[in-house]
Amino acid sequence: MACRVAGNNNNPEQLWQSLLQKKDASGEIPEMRWEPYLRRDSRNAKILKETTSRGYFLDRLEDFDGQFFGISPKEAEQMDPQQRLSLEVTWEALENAGITARSLSGSDTAVFWGVNSDDYSKLVLEDLPNVEAWMGIGTAYCGVPNRISYHLNLMGPSTAVDAACASSLVAVHHGVQAIILGESKVAIVGGVNALCGPGLTRVLDKAGAVSSEGRCCSFDNDVKGYGRGEGAAAIVLKNLSAAIKDGDHIMAVIKGTAVAQDGKTNGIMAPNAKAQQLVAHNALKVGNIDPLTVGYVEAHATSTPLGDPTEVSAIAAVYGADREPEAPCFIGSIKPNIGHLEAGAGAMGFIKAVMAVQKGVLAPQANLTTLTKKIDWDNVGLKVVQQETKWPATDDVRRAAICSYGYGGTVSHAVIEQFNFPETLDLKPGASATNPTVLLLSGPQEKRLPIQARALRNWLQADGSQQDLQRVAATLAVRRDHHDYRAAIVVESKEDAIQALGHLADGANDAWTSQSRVFGSGINRDVVWVFSGHGAQWADMGKELLQNPIFYQAVQPLDEIVEAEIGLSPIALLRSGEFEASDHVQILTYIMQIGISAVLHSHGVYPQAIIGHSVGEIAASVVAGALTAEEGAVLITRRSVLYRQVMGQGGMILVNKPYAEVAQELAGREDLVVAIDSSPSSCVVAGSTEAVAEKAAEFKERSIKTFTVRTDIAFHSPMLNQLVDPLMQSLEGSLAPTTPTRAKLYSTSLRDPRGSDLRDATYWANNMVNPVHLTSAVQAALDDSYRVFLEVSSHPLVSHSINETIMDAGIEDYCMIPTLARKKPSEKSILHAVGQLHTRGANVDWKSQLSGPWAGGLPNTSWMHKPTWRQIGAGPVSTSQTHDVEKHTLLGQRIGVAGTDTVVYTTRLDNESKPFPGSHPLHGTEIVPAAGLVNTFVKATGATVLNNVVLRVPVAINAPRSVQIVAQREDVKIMSRLIQENEGNNDDSSWVTHTTARWESSSSSPVPAQIDVEATKARIGTRLRDEFSIDYLDKVGVSAMGFPWAVTEHYGNTKEMIARVDAAPSVAADAELPWDASSWAPILDAATSVGSTIFFNEPRLRMPAQIERVDIFTRANPPKVGWLYVQEASDTALASHVSVCDEAGNVVAKFTSMRFSEIEGTPGVSGSMESLVHQMAWPPAVPAEEPLPINKLLLISQDVPLREAYAATISSSTQVTLLANANDLIINRAESLLTKETAIVYIPSQVSSLQDVPKSAETFTWQLLELIKFVVNNALPVKIFVVTSNTGEGETPTALAHAPLVGLSRVIASEHPDQFGGLIDTEVLTFPLTTMRYIQGADIIRIRDGVARTMRLRSLPRHRLIQQQDQQQQQPQLLPRPDGTYLITGGLGALGLEVADFLVTQGARRVILISRRGLPPRRLWSKMEPSSPLAPTITKILDLEARGATIHVLPLDISQLTAADALTTALDTLSLPPVRGVVHAAGVLDNELVLDTTPDAFARVLAPKITGGLVLNEVFPPQSVDFFILFSSCGQLVGFTGQSSYGAGNSFLDALASHRQARGDRGARAFQWTAWRALGMGASTDFINAELASKGITDVTADEAFAAWRHAARYEGIDHAVVLRALPLDADEPLPSPALADIIVRRSASASADSSPSSSPEKQTIPTSGPELKAYLDKAIRGCVAAVLHLPAADEVDSKAALADLGVDSVMTVTLRQKLQQALRVKVPPTLTWSHPTVGHLVGWFAEKVGKE
């Protein structure tokens, strides 16, 4: 159990002491709780003063240890504190129960949690401007149990229970039921309550339920209501038999639970005594319990005048009846101590009852002065516990009942009883109170270890001083979770433990303490045991271990064998400590290693791989299962006897020089040889005594270090050849070797360390005379990914050599651990080694050595709390202080200037307060429309005339501004300055004047004559399309409107126009407008906009610059619908007069001589469309100064003639290997070829027909994927290239089949830039070796005209612009005609329906929607439920038909080859006018990383793109339709992460468009779209938007997308249009994609500086190499991670922790990449944080990249 409630009661034991002392934890609510409500509404202050502010509160509800659970501060602040509390108390409950979270992971464990407070939800979700995605699950009731299940990986039922105040006892009932019914083996139940807001308290005040004192006085005569309380309780339930079997500490047994409802009472909140009795009887019945045997009832007792007496009477009826006066049933309630926890109340009462039955003590009632007189206490058989009372001895078994009721009528009841579980100390053989043991501590972060150590030390000195140390060790090892940062402390006594823990707490390690972080998930933690050879002996070795029964039992049978063979007892030798003879040492080395191995096994440590060194190979073979221990004893004994023949004749020295060099130096000599290859820099030389001494002296003279090996035998030298035959004879029939069965066995006797030779007599003869290849064996283990080595020896002999070998391999994450060392306690040394293995993450079965009883009461995890609370916005600012956006002005707080006629209006302007409902961008920056400024002047002055309105500088909304409108006697002006400039700057120079005017309060001019609308229309004669104005403005770069007006009738020429305008087209004529009806801005915005279109013969992006005069002729509200009459002004070339009329033609307002200015930088007619629509250009590539060192080529192709044709053009100086397919490489590995100088080149085969394209494309893409997977997964140092020929033009079947490789290659290059060299498309069959070497960092390279070229996005070519003499009469080619039929694949998808809407809007009258799923028959449409997923689709189709179109839905899978015939037949059946346009928008998106792709998933994505495109191409051949639009994506152009299959399919569509254009199809066009906002498969989400931003681009709205379509329609002879916008970059920020190089805009250095961790005001110089570079990178990267996670400082980030464990989710990953890229100026691949999951890994990667650059 666990709990956390008011009064600093943070666990059940603290709570119990508080109960015994009758403490009342009530107090005032912390000030911060209600503070947001004081800011939210000025009326709240008075109300809050009247609201009960006292209760039972946690001192620091906001505190949470999110880092422990891997929850970032950003996510944590969006979580209800109830979720945070519940997570922590659940962890504490599991620790209290001795059940590890890891043991429950993946299990059917259930979680039921009482919760019914939504205070935090209201607090954060009502702060609408700051609502975020995580707040949904973060504030939901279900989020409490679901969060527990998620973080513990529990897969059983997980349910929130809301039964008001009965919730948590109902949760207990559900947990019991889940176990009884077999749904779950373990249930975690509980409840929580957090009081974050005043709302419900206010409700309860009104209902009279809450005491004004905010405290509970259960059973008291003066009860006035209850005090609300907060906190959480968690209880772990398990089947009794399972708990006994598992050795759990059973605190109590639940005998019965029941839940019911009290039916229709006097009121829904009124209690019902009968229902309370009934539920109690039901619980007793379940447990077959006599109520007279229940000694105590924990009552609900909320302290209400009605509730308490009702409940007591019900309890009396059940438990008090038939009681003897001297044996009453005791009752009490916990609420006066900790308050009424509402949803958590039942669980807290349950915990109190468990403590009572467990301890046999009844806690006294707090806050009880006089018992209520509404109960006849003398005759009810009940007694309130008023003093601490021992449980009556008359009870055989202590039983208690718990009541809990909800104000909605839920009644619940539980009956529990004590359980006595006899524990016995059953230590394993050989263990005793004085034997050493190991204490294990851990934490998710390193800084937790000292805190945990301090807590355990303090406990051992106090509450745990009487606990058995072995039990404490068992608890920590077996009953607690082991996190990534670990400490293992070997101790012999409690005093020893206290001292060692103190050292760790103070940051100093004890000699027997090991501390480390476990190796990351990408590092193999399996252990290689290394059995070293001769030379580890020391006096007294083994003496201590002989006292260990495990050691003794392992060596005693071997002792008998040796003694029978040679009359010598190894055990006796070990006890004597006298064994210098070489033959004795060999035998004892073997004996020790076998004994140590047995002790290690007893501690739960086993090898996964084994290396034997020299004589150590014998024990290694035994432990691996290749020999028996007895065979090993015979072998070592007989060989040692033979050694006596050569004793005293030889010697050995260790030489500090590589094996190969010394071997070359000694070549040809028999008296002196290299015997052991120890490490890359050392070896051992053996030979005759004289030769060794002579060579040692020579080495000394040459300053080469040598060390003498303690032996008089020249092991592993020709001197032992004479012993080979005798050895073979002596072993004949004595060995029966087998293949190793227990672990992988590496050989040091064979040239191939992985050799599988049987360990027979021949092997051991070779082992005796051949050199020892230790370096090779260790290197093989490293190559097989082993990183943990344990030397099994009496003293570390080869550890240094192995360390050298590992460091020479450049491996950083490894460990080399010895077992014993000279003159150190053996038992402690072995435990120390086991502890070191544990701290590195190696598997240790602690149950094998610490399986006995365990200790309860150990300190729980020490939380590292940090305040985590959402900062709530200030709420709505008074309209007296800021402008009202619905009035469309900038008039905020009005301030009169004393003594003058000046009035100043001040306000703040930002994106949240823009005074217009739409969007009004100018070159990407949102500005206030001119109409809004004029409206502001009119409303500020009350003027009817404005003269000389000068619009000087647009009012931009790209950053928050302080705005002032200054109105004087005749003048008015608008000024602003950026708010950040305002800080600390009182200088007027920062104010910008935007607009000025002179004003008159009344007009002397007469109202103009009424406009004769019909006569004007007749005079003009030319009817324009209703969309003329919008289309014209869109064409010149006005992509959106600030107001939603629409033209419904339009006549015009270059001299005059008249247009009927509806200012609010979506609002019915008699309905209320969605803005202030007095606002002139909407209709005036139409006037300024339509007024500019009179210059359509000279299309330019223009904006109003000056208006000579503005007249308002009416005091009435402006018309919703009216006429705009536009005339070309005669006084200037670019000015117009605009009259605003009502529907009758009466002039209500007029702009006289509105002059327009052309916007600087507008590039020709395309305007800002040029920043949206692009072409793919292929300028020459820039070669690198240093070529790639490619000297070997592996050409892989199944097309033999093609492969050989390319090979024939390669210089003979380059080694070329030809392979048929990737499997040849994967199977044969060709390791000698796979070096840094090697390039693997994939050459796809030629394809002869279009029918073969789909299957060939699948084959080619999958073969390339197999190659990249092989190279990446095996960490090969090679680069992969693809070579194609003339793919770019898409003219041939081969080009179409190869095209998917283009998109695939771009994504591969993005995800694996270090392994992928690029795709090179040649124009002739000449191998592009020079291009491969010199064109670096490019994903796709085309060689045309002999020049290597790379793709860049550029504006559409102006010479392709269709020159139109009459834009109203000539229909653009890519838009529909009323007489045609138009077909859309993917037609029922969101994107397809938007396309249909667009085509209908553009004039299409017949549309066919093709979709795999189709729709139900039309006769069923009217019966469709609104909730049906098809309802929106049907509604959309009916809407299109209501607009005059006919829509046909054709169910057809376009991805099937048979679809062509089916489509043709269907079109014939429909018998519609000819199809004039096709839009292929069908597709499937299956995002997977390159390494995770499967053939099936890839084929599923390719089919609708490739087969679907070819089907349409067959049915509608080139030139048979006006337009053939293919919906592609820009994802493959910029290498969108996870879109390898989607990118491949889309690049095929790009090629198909080129293929058709090459056949004269002018209407074939592929659109490479960016993400459509909220639409389609590429719909922009938080993740997509972050990924787009990381690529330097944005999404588009549907309106922008179709504007791009219309823009592209004006160009001919182009086969594609790339639709995206580039984001501006900092001055020195790396280019996200080379494709953007020509369209990107960079900020100036001063403008791009910010204060984020990724760019400080002072640009630091990045070190170029060494420790300084790594230190810099570590700090910078941790700073970026901290910024993403909203951590206060970089120091909060653990460099060794996985980013995912820190709380970095998929969206944050993209943001992190951006920050890293900006901070370190290095392009970051999308998969970097997946392949380099910690800051430490990232430091290594960036160090290499930064060093290169």
Curated annotation (Swiss-Prot):
It comes from Aspergillus aculeatus (strain ATCC 16872 / CBS 172.66 / WB 5094). It is an enzyme of class 2 (transferase). The active site is at 165 (for beta-ketoacyl synthase activity), 300 (for beta-ketoacyl synthase activity), 340 (for beta-ketoacyl synthase activity), 920 (proton acceptor), 1085 (proton donor). Residues 1169-1629 are annotated as: Product template (PT) domain. Residues 888-1160 are annotated as: Dehydratase (DH) domain. It is found in: Cytoplasm, Cytosol. This is 6-methylsalicylic acid synthase acuA. One of its GO terms (cellular component) is cytosol. Multidomain protein; including a starter unit:ACP transacylase (SAT) that selects the starter unit; a ketosynthase (KS) that catalyzes repeated decarboxylative condensation to elongate the polyketide backbone; a malonyl-CoA:ACP transacylase (MAT) that selects and transfers the extender unit malonyl-CoA; a product template (PT) domain that controls the immediate cyclization regioselectivity of the reactive polyketide backbone; and an acyl-carrier protein (ACP) that serves as the tether of the growing and completed polyketide via its phosphopantetheinyl arm. Its main location: cytoplasm. Pfam families: Acyl_transf_1 (PF00698), KAsynt_C_assoc (PF16197), ketoacyl-synt (PF00109), Ketoacyl-synt_C (PF02801), KR (PF08659), PKS_DH_N (PF21089), PP-binding (PF00550). PROSITE patterns: CARRIER, KS3_1, KS3_2, PHOSPHOPANTETHEINE, PKS_MFAS_DH. Residues 528-843 are annotated as: Malonyl-CoA:ACP transacylase (MAT) domain. It catalyses: 3 malonyl-CoA + acetyl-CoA + NADPH + 3 H(+) = 6-methylsalicylate + 3 CO2 + NADP(+) + 4 CoA + H2O. CDD domains: PKS (cd00833). Residues 888-1006 are annotated as: N-terminal hotdog fold. Residues 888-1165 form the PKS/mFAS DH domain. Residues 1-418 form the Ketosynthase family 3 (KS3) domain. Pathway: Secondary metabolite biosynthesis. Keywords: Cytoplasm, Multifunctional enzyme, NADP, Phosphopantetheine, Phosphoprotein, Transferase. GO terms for molecular function: 3-oxoacyl-[acyl-carrier-protein] synthase activity; 6-methylsalicylic acid synthase activity; fatty acid synthase activity; phosphopantetheine binding.
